Each structure stands twice: as structure tokens, then as C-alpha cells.
């Protein structure tokens, strides 16, 4: 049979992690196979039709900065865009887009089908080919064998998936899709720690049965933001509003009186649900003092009447779902198109992974997305891109790569997962990053695109656009630095008139821009400068106004980096290190940290223990790198 069976990288799963993994590998010139159980669901948004949000948009921008598809697909499908925390500092500002579910999926599929070096094949994976602790390939449902140097598993909620509605349950990967049972059994045979997690989704509502006149309209921002560094507002489809309503005492009474019929509260569901996206029954139980909860009514797309009621995810029986939905203002006559449900699935302890997202026990086997205990499209996409990149690097015989915590939210995400593990679905927040003033969403390209080009992830068009932006920032900063304004001149008076800022002596425009009361646009207007690219202007203003804070963070990073990057030998025996308690020896032996920095973040590992590790490394000569940099 003349059918390709040998590839360099195989990606299992065509969700948000799988698509980014396959695209990253193929962009690097590696022959890549994407296996999916259904080509029609590539890039499907299983839960809410939205991309971005606090912490999450930072990941999307980083995926974009490394050449990924998520941000551009959002710009081409986004039907409402907003910047959250717009009145706060730039570190925590976040772009969020409501997407047309059908358009988003179509855009992702188009990108996949036009990517060189990428083959797509519709077949479920039932088995892994493993020889001498190295993955060699996969076996599909109909017995086809595909071989590769690296395999990336991005199975989402499909591994042993079990769907719950009330006290009834059935096998499923998500509503309408079969689970992956054979692969789940095979994975449990591997020497990896496995657990169960749970997530859920709300019932979908027919918009023609909803009274929007009693709800609060929530329009998008003007001017309309964009998600991708390569995007523009002209890409966006027609923009629409979302709406806000609330649960009430009657809603809460309905839920509370039926908790005995909830699979969560009757012990049927074993998996732990997401803390930061709780079901409505969980909200009522945990926040019993609250009289109401917000419900965001989000359109699913421009060509459908379906609405996504964000805030009432539930696995209660259907009759209870209907009653609680109709108790909410504006939805008294609501027609439910699809019931809400909860889904339980297998995940694997991410502490069994390296920074590359390769498993420690099976060479060439990489995990990305919900299989690692995360929740969210953005977290999945970020892991997929990293796993796909490292799978390709391995196939090419090159060293693996992962950004540090001070370089990217992707680095924070991976470090948290492989060091701390997770007992509940992990969601990204800006508060998880120590260096968030440096890790802003607006500068993701300046932080990562050069590295992406070096890795082979960035095409010529994106590289040219990046270089133009980077050079434009340098030119404008130099112009502002070398342009001086004197008191009692026409320009000086224009600045006084516009900002009420007296000039006691000569100032450069860069010094003036550092003042809190002076903004870049007003400064250019007052001094007669020419308009420049808004992205360039934004960077110049942020870098100037926050220069002191940014410099302090950079100094702190430089001090920590020497010990942070010191690698721990793979064969280190912690039980032989004098002075380490048995508890700490056990924690280090179980986690097997790759660097001293990672070891320092393991719960219970003290600064004194890190000092003992340093002494041990110097004794055996493994601390040479630290000594040279000191």
C-alpha cells in the first residue's frame, strides 16, 4: 500500500493544543502527521466561544509571537472585542474576544490544510508503539501503524471521558463525540501518575426565546482592538453586543432543593472541577451568602440564534436546568437547544514531564493541554505550541527549549505544572507571574519573536513586520531623546497650554513623556511630530513611563538567573547529600527538578536545602557554570 507511514512528528488530537503543536512542528520543516477522530471538528471550541481574558490573552499573544494560529483565527472570527482592566496598568490589561464558533473552526482548518509539511488523517489512536522506553509510533483504530521520532498527545477531555447529566452518565469525549477508551487503557499501563478531573458547560439557549429588553447591553470597545500582531480591525466580521442578566433567589432555591440530584454533590463525579470556572450549583453551595450571580449572554455566531449563558455551567438533570434557566430575568420563555453537562476525564500528573513537555519515562512522548491538568483554550494552545516545537527539535537532533518564568507566561505555565503539579484544572492569571510588568501582552513579540525565528517558527512576512516594529521603536525613542524643548519657545508654550506643565529648563521629549500627566499622542500633537504606527507608539510610551520599574525587575532577574539556570545532574542521588532531611530528599527525588531554580519552587524545599545543593554541586564539579558567572 503506497500510503505514508513514516513521519518525524505525530500529533494526536485536533483541538487547540493539537492544532498549534502540528502547525509548529510543520513550520519548522518537520514532516508532521495530525491524527484526529473527526476532520470536521478541527479547531472546534468545545465550551464558550471566546478567546483571551485576564492572563489568557498574554498566552494568546505569546502563541502569536511564535507564529501560532490562535490570535489570527480570533481576529478573523471575532464578533466582539474588549480590553479588560483598561484603566489599570499595562501589565494586567487583557484583550478578550467573542468569536463566531463556525468561522473560528473554518479559519483554523484552512490554516492547517494550507500548511506545508503537514498531513491530516482522520483516525482515532488506540495504541502507542513503545520500545525500550522510547516511543516509536502509534496504532490507529483500524490497525494502521504510523512511525515517528516524536509523538505529541493532545487528547483534551477524550481519555476515558464520561458525560454526566443529573444522575445519568454515558461515555463521551464531549457531547456528540465518542471517548478514547482504548488509548486511555493503554496510557494507564505506562509508569505515569494518573488522575481524574472534571469540567462542565451550560445549556445553550435559542436567542429568539430571550427578552433582551430587560437585560444590560454590553457592547464591544471602540476603536475595536485586535488580537494578533499581524492582525487589523479590517479582518473582523460584523460586531455584536453581549448582554448581562443575573440569577436570583428563586434560581438559587431551585438549585439548592435539587442538589441531591446533582452528580457533583451525590458522589457520582470523582474528578475535581475548575476553581475559577465553577458550576452554578457549586457557586450556590460555596457562596451561599450571595443573592445573585452575573450571567453573560454571549452569541455563538452571526449565522445562528444559539446563545451561550456564561455563568450557569451545570450538570443538574434537564428538568432542573429548564426550571433554573426560566427563573432568570429575560429568559422566562427560554428554549434550551442543548442541555448543559459535566465531563470527567483522565489527566496525567505534569510533574512527570520535563520542561520540554516530554515525559520523563518515555523518550519522545510529549503531552499538551488538558491531559496535563490545565483548563482553557489558551493554556492548551500554548502547551501545544511548545510541545510541537520540542517534538520537532528532538526529531532534528537539536536541544529542547522552554522560555523561563521571566521570559514568558508560557514559562510560568510550564514551570508551575511540572514543579507544583495540580490537583484541579489549572488556569492562568497575571497574578501567577512574578515579573508581569515585563511580561505584558503588548510586548510578547519583542520578547519571543527573535527566538521563534531562530527555532524556525517565524515566516519571512512576520519577521519583516517584527523587524519594522522593533526598528521603529528604536528610531522613535532616539528621536524623542535627541529632540529638546526650551522654556519660552513656541513648542514649550504649546506643552504648557496642553498639559499645564511648566518648563523650568530645557527637557528632551523623552524626559517629558516620562511625566505621568503627559501622554504620547498629546506630546506629538503639541510638538508637531508625525504620526507613527500605533503599536510603535504604545511601546515607546509604556517603556518610557515604566522605565524605572522595568529596570528594577530586570536587575532582580539578572541576580536570580545565575542560580536559576544551574542544571542539576540527571543522576544526582539526593539521599547521599548530607544535611538534607528525609522529607526534602523525598520531594526532590520524586519531582527530579531539572534546575536549581525549579528545585527552589518545590513546596517544602527550604532556602537552606538549596544552599546544601549548591555546596554539593560545587563538590562534584557540576557548579562550574555558577562559579564562572559569579
From Swiss-Prot:
Keyword entries, A-Z: Cytoplasm, FAD, Flavoprotein, NAD, tRNA processing
Q: Which residues bind NAD(+)?
A: 273-287
Which GO-annotated molecular functions does the record name?
flavin adenine dinucleotide binding
Q: Which residues cross the membrane?
A: none
Binding site residues for FAD: 13-18
Entry keyword tRNA processing: yes
Q: Does the keyword Cytoplasm apply?
A: yes
Give the subcellular location. Answer: Cytoplasm
A cellular component annotation (GO) from this entry:
cytosol
| A GO biological process held by the record | tRNA methylation
SUPFAM superfamilies associated with the record: FAD/NAD(P)-binding domain (SSF51905)
Say which domain of life the source belongs to: Bacteria
Q: How does it assemble?
A: Homodimer. Heterotetramer of two MnmE and two MnmG subunits.
The task this protein performs is described as: NAD-binding protein involved in the addition of a carboxymethylaminomethyl (cmnm) group at the wobble position (U34) of certain tRNAs, forming tRNA-cmnm(5)s(2)U34.
Spell out the protein name for this chain: tRNA uridine 5-carboxymethylaminomethyl modification enzyme MnmG
The gene designation is mnmG
Amino acid at each position: 500500500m503506497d500510503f505514508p507511514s513514516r513521519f518525524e512528528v505525530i500529533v494526536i488530537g485536533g483541538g487547540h493544543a493539537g492544532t498549534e503543536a502540528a502547525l509548529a512542528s510543520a513550520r519548522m520543516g518537520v514532516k508532521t502527521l495530525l491524527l484526529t477522530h473527526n476532520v470536521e471538528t478541527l479547531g472546534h471550541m468545545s465550551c464558550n466561544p471566546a478567546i483571551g481574558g485576564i492572563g489568557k490573552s498574554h498566552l494568546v499573544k505569546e502563541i502569536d509571537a511564535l507564529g501560532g494560529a490562535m490570535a489570527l483565527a480570533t481576529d478573523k472570527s471575532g464578533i466582539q472585542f474588549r480590553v479588560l482592566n483598561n484603566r489599570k496598568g499595562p501589565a494586567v490589561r487583557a484583550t478578550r474576544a467573542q468569536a463566531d464558533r463556525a468561522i473560528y473552526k473554518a479559519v483554523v482548518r484552512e490554516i492547517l490544510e494550507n500548511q506545508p509539511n503537514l498531513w491530516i488523517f482522520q483516525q482515532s489512536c488506540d495504541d502507542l508503539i513503545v520500545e525500550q522506553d522510547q516511543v516509536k509510533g502509534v496504532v490507529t483504530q483500524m490497525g494502521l501503524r504510523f512511525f515517528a521520532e516524536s509523538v505529541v498527545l493532545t487528547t483534551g477531555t477524550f481519555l476515558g471521558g464520561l458525560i454526566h447529566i443529573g444522575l445519568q452518565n454515558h461515555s463521551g469525549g464531549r457531547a456528540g463525540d465518542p471517548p478514547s477508551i482504548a488509548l486511555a487503557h493503554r496510557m494507564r499501563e505506562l509508569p505515569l501518575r494518573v488522575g481524574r478531573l472534571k469540567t462542565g458547560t451550560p445549556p445553550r439557549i435559542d436567542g429568539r426565546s430571550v427578552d433582551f429588553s430587560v437585560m444590560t447591553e454590553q457592547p464591544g470597545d471602540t476603536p475595536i482592538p485586535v488580537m494578533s500582531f499581524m492582525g487589523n480591525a479590517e479582518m473582523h466580521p460584523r460586531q455584536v453586543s453581549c448582554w448581562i442578566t443575573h440569577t436570583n433567589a428563586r434560581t438559587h432555591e431551585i438549585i439548592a432543593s435539587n442538589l441531591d440530584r446533582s452528580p457533583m454533590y451525590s458522589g457520582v463525579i470523582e474528578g475535581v472541577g475548575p476553581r475559577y470556572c465553577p458550576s452554578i450549583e457549586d457557586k450556590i453551595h460555596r457562596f451561599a451568602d450571595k443573592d445573585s450571580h452575573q450571567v453573560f449572554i454571549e452569541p455563538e455566531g452571526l449565522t445562528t440564534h444559539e446563545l451561550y449563558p456564561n455563568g450557569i455551567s451545570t450538570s443538574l438533570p434537564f428538568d432542573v436546568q429548564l426550571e433554573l434557566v426560566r427563573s432568570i430575568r429575560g429568559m422566562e420563555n427560554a428554549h434550551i437547544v442543548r442541555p448543559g453537562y459535566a465531563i470527567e476525564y483522565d489527566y496525567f500528573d505534569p510533574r512527570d514531564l520535563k520542561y520540554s513537555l516530554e515525559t520523563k519515562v518515555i523518550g519522545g512522548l510529549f503531552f499538551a493541554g488538558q491531559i496535563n491538568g490545565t483548563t482553557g483554550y489558551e493554556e492548551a494552545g500554548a502547551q501545544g505550541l511548545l510541545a510541537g516545537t520540542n517534538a520537532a527539535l528532538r526529531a532534528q537532533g537539536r536541544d529542547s527549549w522552554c522560555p523561563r518564568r521571566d521570559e514568558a507566561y508560557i514559562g510560568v505555565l510550564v514551570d508551575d505544572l511540572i514543579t507544583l503539579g495540580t490537583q484541579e484544572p489549572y488556569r492562568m492569571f497575571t497574578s501567577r507571574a512574578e515579573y508581569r510588568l515585563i511580561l505584558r501582552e503588548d510586548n510578547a513579540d519583542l520578547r519571543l519573536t527573535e527566538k521563534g525565528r531562530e527555532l524556525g517558527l517565524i515566516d519571512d512576512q512576520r519577521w519583516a513586520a517584527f523587524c519594522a516594529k522593533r526598528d521603529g521603536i528604536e528610531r522613535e525613542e532616539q528621536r524623542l531623546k535627541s529632540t529638546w524643548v526650551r522654556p519660552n519657545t513656541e513648542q514649550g508654550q504649546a506643552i504648557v497650554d496642553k498639559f499645564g506643565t511648566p518648563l523650568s529648563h530645557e527637557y528632551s521629549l523623552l524626559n517629558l513623556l516620562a511625566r505621568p500627566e503627559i501622554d504620547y499622542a498629546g506630546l506629538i500633537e503639541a510638538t508637531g511630530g508625525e504620526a507613527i504606527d500605533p503599536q510603535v507608539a504604545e511601546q515607546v510610551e509604556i517603556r518610557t513611563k515604566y522605565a524605572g520599574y522595568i529596570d528594577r525587575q530586570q536587575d532582580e532577574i539578572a541576580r536570580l538567573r545565575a542560580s536559576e539556570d544551574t542544571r542539576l545532574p540527571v543522576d544526582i542521588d539526593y539521599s547521599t547529600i548530607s544535611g538534607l532531611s528525609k522529607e526534602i530528599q523525598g520531594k526532590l527525588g520524586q519531582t527530579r527538578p531539572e534546575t536549581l531554580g525549579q528545585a527552589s519552587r518545590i513546596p517544602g524545599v527550604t532556602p537552606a536545602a538549596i544552599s546544601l545543593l549548591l555546596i554539593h554541586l560545587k563538590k562534584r564539579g557540576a557548579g562550574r557554570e555558577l562559579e564562572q558567572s559569579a
